[in-house]
Amino acid sequence: MLDIKDLTFRYRAGRTAVFHNFSLHLEEGNIIGLLGKNGTGKSTLLYLIAGLLHPQQGKVLYKGIETQIRRPEVQEEMFIVPEEFELPNISLSRFVELNRPFYPKFSNDILEQALRDFELPVDLQLEALSMGQKKKVFMSFALATNTRLLLLDEPTNGLDIPSKTQFRRVISQHMTDERTVIISTHQVHDVETLIDRVLMLEGQRLLINDTTAHICEQLRFEQRPYGQDISDALYAEPSLAGTALITRGDGFQNTQIDLELLFNALTQHPDLLETPQNV
């Protein structure tokens, strides 16, 4: 579905490249967590995928078509929700009327259901909303477009705890086998139970492109009290409960993935996983 081939991108000539000879392949039907430190290019990658930024070298292909060309048949299949955005001072119904023609598969039913799940009315004025409410409305519209590729940049920023729970429920309810959702975030605990594939970026390179299921077959994520033996740990760090650690998995008794612990481990030990990319 999505292929990035030998991509190099920098914002200005002479500046350090955000990506250099970067390649990635993704199939459809996953909720993907795009993780990394601030400044590693998570948002940049989403904009490159959407065709809103152009690489100096290499290609970003959606079903074999370069996204930077912005052909209508590609644009109607993808939607991006930026971290920060402005909505016009109009009603939601007018916003839908103006924008739905660009998305042939748009569904009013999905829009209304998502708004209900976010506890928002269907008939509302966009200018009267808080930033968190605007984010919920825009994500509801994004889901209603029924695009095959949905790009979300820091979607839980500005949401309170109940709203983050609503977000996870809304995304999971409207997933299909044909849809791919890429969520860029540094708030990993907000999406830990939602995603089924992990992309981790670190210093112009891809640390990992793997499913959470495969990761949990290979690795166990544990908390042990102070003083307990951790000689079997592949990686360990102090935690409030004692020690957070990763041990080798047996493929049978899987544990819940700890994305923050995994990221910290992989930045120090990139070979921690046997097959870190494109599983």
Predicted feature locations:
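The feature captures the beta-strand-to-loop junction immediately N-terminal to the Walker
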Residues: 35-37
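Helix-to-loop junction immediately C-terminal to a conserved catalytic motif
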Residues: 50
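Catalytic Walker B motif of ABC-type/P-loop ATPase nucleotide-binding domains
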Residues: 150-154
